[in-house]
Structure formats: C-alpha cells, structure tokens
Swiss-Prot record:
Phylogenetic lineage: Eukaryota, Fungi, Dikarya, Ascomycota, Saccharomycotina
Localization terms from the record: Cytoplasm
Protein name (database record): RNA polymerase II assembly factor RTP1
Region (Disordered): 630-652
Superkingdom, taxonomy of origin: Eukaryota
UniProt function note: Required for the cytoplasmic assembly and the nuclear import of RNA polymerase II. May facilitate the starting interaction between RNA polymerase II subunits RPB2 and RPB3 and the subsequent interaction of the resulting complex with subunit RPB1. May also participate in the transport of RNA polymerase II through the nuclear pore complex.
Quaternary structure and interacting proteins, as annotated: Interacts with RNA polymerase II subunits RPB2 and RPB3. Interacts with the R2TP complex. Interacts with the nuclear pore complex subunits NUP100 and NUP116.
Record-level GO BP terms: protein import into nucleus; protein secretion
Family: Belongs to the Tango6 family.
Keywords assigned: Cytoplasm, Repeat
One GO cellular component, as annotated: cytoplasm
UniProt source species: Saccharomyces cerevisiae (strain ATCC 204508 / S288c) (Baker's yeast)
Length: 981
C-alpha cells in the first residue's frame, strides 16, 4: 500500500514538474544562425527562382559574385571549427561520451562543406580539371535531381585566389597538430578530402614551388594509405586534363613505396576489396602483379626492388592473413620467373642472414619471430623450385652447405623444446609482461600447438615440398647439436620469446667447466633422450613410410660401420677403450634404431626388398669385422684357450649382428611368401652368408630353415614389368596421405602430385577421380588451397578438354542446386583462365558449350531468379570469349547481344526491394561486354538488328536514365569509342 502511494506521489510530481530547458551552447546558437542566415535563404531562393538562367545562388546571401559568396561560407566554417573545438573541450572536461555535433546538426555541417566544395573548389577549376559531379557521391544528389544550389552561374570566371583561400582553410584544419579534432575527422573521412587534395595539386601546377609541394605531402600524411589509394584512383579515372592527371598518376604509382610501413598491404587490400568483403577474383591478383612488376619512372631498378622487397618481407610476417600471403607469394613467383637473382638477392639473402646469423650479430625476438613467419608464408608458395632455391642454394662464403638450412631450423626447434617452458602467446594475452614489444609480433594461429611444434611443421613443409628427404640423415647425425659455435639462442624471461645473441668467448671459457663430471654425463644423456624424442615426434609428423624406412636403413648401416670402426680401434688400442665420441654416436644411433623399430616396425618391413638388400650388405660388414677382431686377438694373446676364444668370437654376442638377425626375422615373419619370392636372389645370397658362419646358434638355424622353406615351396619369378605401376601407386598413396595432412602446404603438394599422375596418364587413378578430388578441395576456405585448385583445374582442362569441360560446365550450371555459389564462381575463374590460355584456339563445340552454359545463366528467370553475382560471372566469361577470339565464336554474338539489350532495357533499379539492389552489377557487365566486342572486332561482327544506330540509341537512353554513376561513366567512355570507330 505504501509502495502504491509512493508511486502515485512520484508520478504526480513528475507530471506537475515544469520542463527544464537545457541552456543552449555556443554551438547550438551557431547552428541556429547558420540555418537562419545561410541554409534557409539558399533553399528559399532555389524554390523562388526556379530554373531562371539569369538568377544566381549568390543572390541568396546578397553576394554579387563567387568570391563574396565563398567568403561568407568560409567565415561560417571557421566559426564552426572554433565552436566544435570548444564543445570538445567541455565534453572532455565533463568526461562525457556525447558527440560534439548531434546527428540532427550534422546535416548543416554536410551542407556547408558541400557548398564550399562546389562553389569554392569546383567553380574555380576548369571542367577538365575537376571531379565530375556524378562521381562526387554527395548524399543529397540523385540522378536527374541536381539542385540549383550546386550550380555555378555561366558568367562566373575562375578565380585562383578564391580557390587558394578555400584550400588554405581546409588545409589548416586537416593538418593541425591537435590530438582530437572532430571536424577534421569529418572532412578526412568524407568526399571533401579528394576535392581539397585535387585543388591543392592544381594550385601547385599553376605556380610550382617547394612550399606547395610540401603542403601536398603534409596533406597526404593526414590520410591513411588505403584511403589515399581510393582517392588517387578516383582522380585518375575522372580527371581529363593530362597535365593534372600526370602528377596524380605519379603519386598513385609511387604511393606503395612512399608508405613503407603499409603501402604494399594497403594496395593489396584496396585492389582485392578485402575490407569491403568482396569476392576474391584471380584477375585482381593479376592486376596487382601488373602494377608492381613495373617500376615507377622516377626510381632506379635497385631502389625500387630494395624498397618493394622490404615491404614484401614485412607482409609475409602476417601469417594469419592468408589472402595477403597468397598474393605476395604470387608476386614473388612472378619476379622469380623473370629473374631468379631478384628474389635471391632481395628476399632470400635476408632470410638466410638471420637463419645462419651471417654476418654475425645479435637479433631481437621480433626479428627471429619474423623470419620464421616469413618461412611459414613462403612454404605456401606454389613453386617447389623457388622453395628449393631458398633451402639449398646457400652462399659458399659463409661456409654453409645446402643441408644446413634444414639443420639450423632443426636446432632452433630443439632449442625451443628444451628451453621454452611457457607459451609466449598466452603470456602476451595475460599481459604478464610489461614489455610492449610483443604487440608488433605476429604469432601463427595454432594456439593448441606449442611453438616448437610450429617450427617442426615448417621443417616438414620445406622438406616435403622440395623433396629433400636426403637431409633427414643429416638431421639424424646432429641430434646432439643444441648450439652454434659463435652464437646462441636465448629466452627472454619476461616474454618467453627467443632471440639471438653472439657468444662472448671470454665468458664462455670462464664458465666452461661447470658441474661435476657425473652431472655433465647426466645432462648429456638427458639431452640425448630429449633430442631423440623430438626427432621421433618429427618423423611421426612427417608420416612417410618410405622415408622412415630409408632413414632407418641408413642409420642401421651407419651404426654397424661405426661399431666396426670402434671395435677395431679398441683392438688396436692397448687400453681397449673406444673414444668418447665413438661411444656417443653409437649409443645415439642405437637408441634411435630402437625407437624407430618400436614405432615403425610394420612400415619398415612393408616393402622388404630394400631391407633385404641392406641386410645382405651388412652381413658382409659384420663378418669382415669379426674376422679382423679374431686376427688381432690371436696375435695379441696366444695363450687364450680355444674354448674361451670361441666364446669371444660368437656372432650372437655381437650387438650389431643381433639387430641384423632380428630385422631379418621380422621381414621373414611379417612379409608374405609371394612378395619375398620376388627377391629370391637376395634371400639366396643371405642364406649362403649365414651358412658360412661357424656357429651352432639356434636363431640362425631357424632363419635358414625359413628361407629354405620359402625358396623350395614358391616360384621364383620377378615382376620387373610392373615397377613403374608400383612407383605410381606409391606416389598415389603419398598424394592421398598429403591431402589429409593438417598443414596447408602439404595438402597443396598432394594436389600437385595427383596432377602429375594425371599428366602422365597413369592407370592407377582416373582423370575423373582427379577432377572430383579437385572439386572437393575447391570448397576449402583457405585461399592458398582453392587458388591452387583453380590453377590445377585449368591444367586438367588443357590436358583432356573433351572429358573435363563438360563436367565443369555441369558443375557451373548447377541445375540441381547442389553446389555453393562461391564454388560455382570459382569454376567461372577456371573457364576464364582456360579461355586465356587457349587464345585463338578457343572455338568449336567446347567453346560453344561454355558460352551456352553462360547464356542460360545470364537470361533472366522470373520464376527462379539467380544471384546477380553468378550472372555477372557468366557475363565476364562471355566478355573474355569476345576479347580472346570473337571471330571464333561469331555464331553466338547475336545471342550475347540479345542478353545485353534485355539487361539494359528491362533490368532497371529496384529501389522497392527490401534487400540491397544489385541490379547495377548486370548493367555494368552488359556495358563491358559491348566494349569487349567493339574493342576486339569493331563493327564487323555486329548483327543487323543490333547495328551502330540502335546501339548508340540504347546507350544514350540508359546514360540519361540510369542512377548508377559507374554505369553512366562507362557508357560515356563507350560512346566515345563508338564515335571514334
């Protein structure tokens, strides 16, 4: 009850409280004045004057000319700036989150700025020097509704002083050193910036001087690089005056290098439309390559390549931006194909200088992390030759050999495994460290993996893609190599990030003898176990049966030979003690053999021929070793009893001999008789050698019995005729395994292997199966994968067009609606690539198959309308057909023009739609297709019903009616082409 009463009292008080009027700010008063004395008079004058040619908007403010009118507007703008800054100061002092200018008042700001752009800048530029009104994108402008307030009187003459005054006022606002200026943000983010920059450039051209040149630079510095690309592109596309276009084009072409911190990345983002979430188009990649493969006229080759590759290197560190990395890899490959030395001198040298630390110097955590990221990005390059040059073409002057590149990466992984106890990424997230240097370091998106595992994955990618498996043996020889001679890795305790430090030789000698001998031995054995554990982890990650078997046999041969040499030296040495180094190597190899045998036993003996050959060879080595030892022992001790001597020389007491016999036993028991019989000549050789030993060991007797049983009960036939097929089957197995690998570069490698099998027409896999696998991986979201698939599908089209093209056309038509639109569009890219490669050979029934498929998609379907992106893709393919060989597909030109006329006449803007209207896409593509036809053959192939007069009439009509400024702009250019033909 009390609550109800209290509620009633509160409501009563509220209802009877008089409104509390907020005190007007100076800014509120300003906007009232602006509305009363500028905006309203102009609007009223526009309504009253109508379309009278004798009237002028300047009369609305009682001004006689443009200069007086602009002076009034400038005074208002300067007052606005003062009031906005004061309002910002008050809001900051009161810690308010309010905006300095309300949304209601923003319309006055926009109107004032627009008036200054039109009457202050545009009116004082010649028609060929200014941005066309249609391209200004002023929000209040609609097609056919240009307001009189934006019209300049015909009697007005250009006044450079007025232009200079306007530019100076805007320039001072944009380049002010204030940390916060709301009005500056409005101008820099709107369409005004491009007009201000253009006006300043024109003033500089009219009166060139160092001061105005510096002003242009200062004005550029106020804008982010990405936006500048848009501004300069707009100016280049719209400005007709060649004298003005030339410096603008120069600014655009050099912008990438003049912004070393983000010029290249911004260019890629801008052209690919990454920030606008546009579909990735291969043609856009080619456009970037075309831009960057040509140096600006103002730079030497050395300057250009030096500056460009610095940014390429920095861009490759962004491992979590796959589109950027894919584009950069494509650019690097373009330079590599032009001249290998360019990539080697300007990119690879920097990578090697840090990996090998040559010249000798310290490297920060960021430098070390960056070079690993660069390698991760480069491992995704589509060229195995390029990667092979990186890892094997090492300079001789620093004393390195090809295999050492892999070794140095391995040592780094080994160091991380041993010393990096905490994840630096987690430390950075938790802000445990006060060191903010980690903010600029890019970590791979493998949060579930420890960093040493990332490095192991990199090592795997480099070895597999370059097929340098022979260097696995080099790694196995250096498992105990934790450090470098003159420099070392260290861990920053705060950030857990590794860095490189040059060793202090004096300090190293001072602290060399640390700990007791027993502790040193213990640490040595722990390091050995750690390195073997990591190496086994790497072999499991490698997941290659053949290479694991080859490595096992190499280590086995090495171990037997080392054991033989060690025992021989022990026999020659009166002390009978082998060297420490020999013991360490023998022990390491023995442990590694045991681990590999336990982990890969089945895989090692899966294909027994190589194993049997090695066993056959090693029996000779062991036999030779025993005979040598026997001679030495006989000479050194004649008094040894015969029974004792026999016991010393028993082969079964020899560890290497034991392992060989165990391996032979495993092969005989795990392999089928039919497979073993294919290697009967090796089995016979092994049997003879085992029988030559003077021993009664039951193990040898059992092995001899097994071999005899196989040889007696089977047929000794060889299958030399199927060796090539067996090799192809191995390659296929390897490719399928690679496709299921989690690492992106390895997946791509698997696709490449499949294409190699298809190219050689191997019977182990059909072309249709290769195609289906490629289409499955076309759905992969990683651009590195699906761009590789697009490239591969193009190759398959060239290989067997009669088989592949009909299947791809069916996929692209998507009549059963089973395929995602994104995947369909990617197949469209395949068609474009194929048409370009065919060039003038693109004709005949397969060409018509592609064209007819595209026409069926382009034609409007009222019952089931198709996505305009799909239809535009088909229009692009049709346009490419006309560009490449219009005469070869002339029978379909009438059908193409049917679609074009239908689109331009019937597919008008649909503003009533709830969804975004994208009909302009089709109208743009229709105009493009006409351009492609005229550019290719002129009027020669125009059908009678679509002759010159009808074409010009249609284009002129669309130009007058269409609301899309790009459509209008393209038609203007096309009409110019029509008149010139």
């Amino acid at each position: 009850m009390n609550e109800d009463k209290e509620q009633k009292i509160n409501i009563h008080d509220i209802l009877n409280t008089r409104p509390k009027l907020t005190k007007k700010t100076a800014l509120d008063v300003f906007f009232e004045d602006l509305d009363d004395n500028v905006i309203t008079p102009i609007n009223e004058y526009v309504l009253d004057s109508g379309s009278s040619s004798s009237s002028s908007i300047y009369q609305a403010l009682k001004c006689s000319n443009n200069n007086e009118f602009v002076a009034v507007l400038l005074q208002k703008f300067q007052n606005l700036h003062i009031h906005v800054l004061e309002q910002q100061r008050r809001l900051i002092e009161s810690k308010s989150d309010l905006l300095p200018i309300s949304l209601h008042d923003m319309k006055y700001v926009d109107e004032l700025i627009n008036l200054l752009i039109i009457h202050g800048i545009d009116a004082n530029l010649s028609p060929t020097m200014k941005i066309p009104f249609d391209s200004k994108r002023i929000n209040t402008f609609k097609k056919g509704q240009k307001s009189a307030e934006y019209e300049t009187p015909r009697w007005h003459t250009i006044n450079n002083d007025t232009l200079s005054q306007v530019i100076t006022v805007f320039y001072n606002v944009l380049t002010s050193e204030r940390s916060s200026d709301y009005l500056r943000e409005i101008i820099s983010k709107g369409s005004a910036y491009a007009n201000i920059l253009l006006g300043l450039i024109v003033l500089h051209l009219q009166l060139p001087n160092r001061y105005s040149s510096q002003m242009i630079t200062n004005l550029e510095d106020t804008q982010e690089t990405y936006t500048l690309f848009g501004v300069y592109t707009l100016l280049v596309e719209t400005i007709q005056d060649e004298k003005v276009r030339e410096p603008i084009l120069s600014k655009l072409t050099t912008l990438t290098l003049r912004r070393p911190e983000n010029g290249l990345i911004s260019l890629i983002d801008f052209v690919l439309g990454v920030r606008d979430a546009e579909d990735i188009d291969i043609e856009k990649f080619n456009r970037i390559y075309q831009i960057l493969m040509s140096k600006p006229k103002t730079m030497t080759n050395l300057q250009y390549l030096t500056e460009l590759f610095k940014q390429i290197y920095d861009g490759l560190t962004f491992v979590n931006r796959p589109i950027l990395v894919t584009c950069l890899n494509g650019l690097i490959l373009k330079f590599y194909l032009r001249n290998k030395r360019i990539v080697n001198d300007f990119l690879f040298k920097k990578v090697r200088s840090i990996i090998f630390n040559s010249p000798l110097t310290d490297h920060t955590a960021k430098e070390l992390n960056d070079v690993i990221n660069v390698l991760i990005s480069l491992s995704k390059n589509s060229s195995s030759d390029l990667l092979n040059d990186l890892v094997t073409s090492c300079p001789d002057e620093d004393g390195t050999t090809p295999g050492q590149f892999f070794l140095y990466v391995w040592i780094y992984a080994l160091f991380l495994k041993k010393n990096q106890k905490l994840d630096p990424l987690e430390i950075n997230k938790l802000s445990i460290s006060d060191n903010k240097s980690t903010d600029s370091i890019h970590f791979p998106e493998q949060s579930s993996s420890k960093y040493y595992e990332v490095v192991l994955s990199l090592l795997k990618s480099l070895i597999v893609i370059t097929e340098n498996f022979q260097y696995l043996n080099v790694l196995s020889l250096n498992l105990l190599n934790f450090e470098h001679e003159k420099w070392k890795y260290l861990i920053d305790l705060d950030t857990q990030l590794p860095y490189i430090s040059v060793k202090n030789t004096d300090m190293a000698e001072l602290f060399f003898e640390k700990g007791s001998k027993n502790s040193q031995i213990s640490e040595f054995l722990q390091d050995m176990d750690l390195s073997i554990e990591l190496f086994m982890e790497f072999l499991v990650l490698l997941n290659d049966e053949e290479q694991s078997k080859t490595l096992f046999l190499d280590i086995l041969k090495r171990w037997v030979h080392h054991t033989k040499k060690s025992e021989k030296r022990s026999s020659d040495n009166h002390s009978g003690m082998p060297s420490v180094t020999d013991n360490a190597l023998i022990l390491m190899d023995l442990k590694l053999l045991e681990c590999m045998n336990n982990r890969f036993k089945t895989k090692i003996v899966n294909k027994p021929k190589d194993v049997l050959i090695v066993i056959d060879q090693l029996i000779d080595v062991v036999q030779e070793k025993d005979e040598t030892i026997q001679e030495v022992e006989a000479d050194s001790d004649d008094e040894v009893e015969e029974g004792e001597e026999t016991e010393e020389l028993d082969p079964n007491e020899n560890s290497s001999y034991k392992i060989i016999l165990q391996l032979l036993s495993t092969v005989l028991s795990e392999s089928s008789s039919s497979i073993l019989l294919q290697n009967s000549y090796i089995l016979k050789s092994i049997s003879r050698k085992l029988q030559s030993f003077n021993t009664n060991a039951s193990e040898i007797d059992a092995l001899l019995a097994s071999i005899d049983n196989i040889l007696i009960n089977g047929h000794t036939t060889e299958r030399n005729d199927n060796i090539e097929i067996e090799m192809d089957e191995e390659r296929l197995d390897k490719a399928i395994t690679s496709l299921h690998d989690p690492l992106v570069p390895i997946k791509s490698y698997g696709l490449t292997e499949l294409r190699h099998l298809a190219e050689k027409k191997s019977p182990v896999i059909s072309l249709e199966k290769v195609l289906q696998i490629h289409l499955d991986y076309l759905k992969n979201m990683d651009p590195f994968i699906y761009l590789n698939v697009i490239k591969g599908l193009t190759t398959l089209c060239e290989l067997e067009p009669e088989t592949i093209l009909p299947l791809l056309a069916e996929f692209y038509a998507n009549k059963k609606k089973k395929n995602r639109l994104d995947d369909v569009l990617k197949v469209g890219e395949v068609f474009i690539n194929y048409i370009q490669r065919q060039n003038e050979l693109f004709q005949g029934k397969l060409a018509y198959l592609i064209i007819d498929t595209c026409l069926s998609i382009v034609r409007p379907n009222d019952s089931k309308p198709l996505d305009n992106r799909w239809r535009m893709s088909s229009m692009s393919i049709l346009g490419m057909c006309l560009q490449i060989n219009a005469r070869g597909v002339s029978d379909r030109i009438r059908d193409m023009l049917d679609c074009v006329f239908g689109i331009l006449q019937l597919e008008q803007p649909q503003n009533h739609l709830k969804d975004k209207d994208d009909s302009f896409l089709m109208r743009r593509s229709a105009v493009h297709l006409i351009h492609d036809l005229l550019y290719s053959t002129g009027f020669d192939l125009l059908p009678f019903e679509y002759n010159y007069d009808k074409l010009k009439t249609l284009l002129s009509y669309v130009r007058d009616q269409d609301e899309d400024y790009m459509v209008c702009e393209q038609i203007d250019k096309l009409l110019t082409v029509l008149d010139s033909l």
